[in-house]
Amino acid sequence: PGASAEEAFAHMVAVLAPLEDPHVSLVDPATQRSFSGGAVPRIVSQALAGLPADADDDAQAAALAATVDTIVRAREGYLDAPAETPIPRVLSAGTVGGRTGYIALDALQLRASLDFPDQADTLAAALDQVLAPLHDLPALILDLRANGGGSDRLSVAVAQRFATRALRVKKRVYEGGKLLDPRTIEVPADAHAYRGELVILTSDLTVSAAEVLTLLLAGRPRTRRLGDTTAGAFSDALYKTLPNGWLVTLSNERYEDEAGHSYEAEGLAPDVPTPAYSLVQLEAGHDAALEAALALVAR
């Protein structure tokens, strides 16, 4: 009582920040004051490290955009020839040395609205297009390091292309003051799925629906994960409007593997821990994690 709006906002941030959850946020539409939770991904810290302390939003956005371009340029330098894809800012693909397939999937959202009805069909068709020439290769690298998530429907569509057996995760929602019984998300086995060795690259940028995809594929035989532990933010965001008009988002879901273990807040650890990104190395055209994945499938 008696606190100013600025003081009240700061108090709310102090309560929310320790959750360290990327799906937790607070926005005051009247002043555009905002807070977003979650730890800052390492590559983002590296990208912003060279900016002055008072750098504005435009300068930070430019630095991050340049870093994305650096990531894409470095990884595509390993490809025999990048394949043409209908959604190039989301999906890229090719082969390395003629024997290993490579697919980079940078989002599980193709439109601003997650509910746009044809997203899953569009991504599925694009995946089928790039997978066709890779289907008979003995190994494939699926790069999810820069995937900021999106829709679980798209996660299922991607997992279907690799489902040599049925893949399952459980989803539990906290509602009405209690955690509801789990609902199973199942991807049935597909006779046309890619059957070779699969290496999934992850980082602390791999978040939300991208983590759900990673968890689904963790149940696939002949699959290993390499890179950094994922962000640990599987849950969707629950949106609420406070009485004073502020907007708050919270996590109210748990995703569990078939054994019932939840990786919310801890992230899904790789089988082969390897630093996912080094900006200095990437600027020199050197992607150490991708090289480690290539070495893994060459054994």
Language-model-derived ranges and their functions:
Residues R111, V207-S208, D257:
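Short beta-strands and strand-coil junctions in structured, solvent-facing domains, enriched
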Residues S208, A218-R220, G227-P243, V248-L250, ...:
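C-terminal soluble interaction/assembly domains
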Residues V15, I103, L142, L198, ...:
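Terminal peptide-recognition signature
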Residues T164-K171, A218-G227:
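Bacterial peptidoglycan biogenesis and beta-lactam-recognition machinery
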Residues G149-L201, L205, S235-T241, N252-E256, ...:
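Gly/Ser/Thr-rich loop/hinge elements
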Residues P1-L140, L144-V173, L179, L238-T241, ...:
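Flexible, low-complexity junctional segments that flank or bridge functional domains
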Residues E264, L268-R299:
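Low-complexity, Gly/Ser/Thr/Pro-rich intrinsically disordered linker/tail segments
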Residues G101-A104, L140-D143, E197-T202, R224-G227, ...:
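Structural recognition of the beta-strand scaffold that forms the well-ordered cores
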